[in-house]
Amino acid sequence: MSIVSFEFLGFLAALAVVYYVLPMRVRKWALLAGSAAFWLLCGWQGAVYLTAETLLIWGCARLIGRFSERRGVCRALLVGGMVTVFGAMVLMKALAQLQALPDGLLVPIGLSYFTFQSVGYLIDVYRGKVTPEKNYAKVLLFAGFFPQMTQGPITTWKQLMPQLDSPHRLSPDGFVSGVFLMAWGFFKKLVIADRLMPAVSMLVATAQELPGWLVLATAAMYAIVLYADFSGGIDIIRGAAELLGIDLPENFRRPFFAASIADYWRRWHISLGVWFRTYLLYPLVASRAGIGLAKVGKRLFGAKAGRAMPGAAASMVVFLLIGVWHGFYWNAVLYGLWFGLLTAAGMLLDPQFRKIRKRVTAHRGGVALMKAFGWLRTMAAVLLAQFFACTTSPGMAFGMMGRIFTDFGAGMTRNFPLGMQDGAVAIIAVLLMLLVDILCEKQSDLRKKLAVSPLYVRWTLLMGLIFLTLIFGCYGAGFDRAAFLYAGF
């Protein structure tokens, strides 16, 4: 079941009614029953996979709690659980990419998301940050909460479980806020992403015939499509959760306003970045290898470089894995390595950048100049990364980049696949999305202010947003065929 479908809206409405009608003490079980129904509607194989994985994680966590004084046993349980679930995930994704899955077997929707969430819980139990849960049903609900499991955001036990475990009263303000967020997500997905994606696909397929300016525009359009698609899906998910009284964390925070690569990744797919920093990057930096690398770096290059080297090396590892997470092909690896190299270089060269920044900002207008330079540098790096993301081979990616420098051109082209009307709608919709992002950047509590605004203001804006989506949205057959780009992960 796609979250962009009338079936999902009907399912959510029915579950919300049942949830708020039932006595408070049993409402969490209504969420579990509703989530189980959602898994089955998405495919029984995925439901079986999720059940088996959470059983393993629950069992390992319980045993870690039982043998907490025996670190060797606990470490073996942690490693065994992680290797098993990550190994199964990698195998499923590899077989799917090779089109070698047995007949009738499908990759569970949101496989990576609920796997990362489950493993995070197991690591937190091992570290003593979370008490092992005795009730398996709660672990199952935590990993498989139905809106979230499709494409995140990835949460921790302490973030999510207290909310799922506590009954919620129907809040008019929360309800309005959730509906607005869902409507805004539908707008971004259906009006922007699904309108631009076919055009981007056609442009990429004919890239060798395009002038360089249009190749560059294609990369920019693809970045917009990814943002509108992924953040739109997250908005729908967070809004649906808010209707049930659950507050999921923000997963995108205006990434195209970032002034550095590090800032960009603090704004883009936030929960994935937090997961990798918490469970991989920080442990790598604090490991014996990280400490040893710092000592070697200090001896060879000085104290500042020595302190930066463990973080730089760990960032390379993290971004390489993020690239592989996107797929088992060279473009995904290059995508991760590109951001890893930029992040590592930023860490190692930070002392030099600080000196330059200090000199420039000492002059009038220097602060604004550095901000503008930082933004342009970051967006150029992000645009180059899109060539790896939107193509299927390094040759295609580098070929598109080459067109920018060898045949930039300045004239129009007959190859642009977006008509005048669709182009106008797309431009206006993107500008509206940009305006909302600017307002949110200046006022982070914009939705809260909207929720308490006069009734006629709320309803006018909400009905207008729904009307625009219904009129200008692009719908697949049955209103659910345009799958989210990140749901397959």
Region spans (language model):
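Membrane-embedded transmembrane alpha-helical bundles that form the catalytic cores
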Residues: 1-488
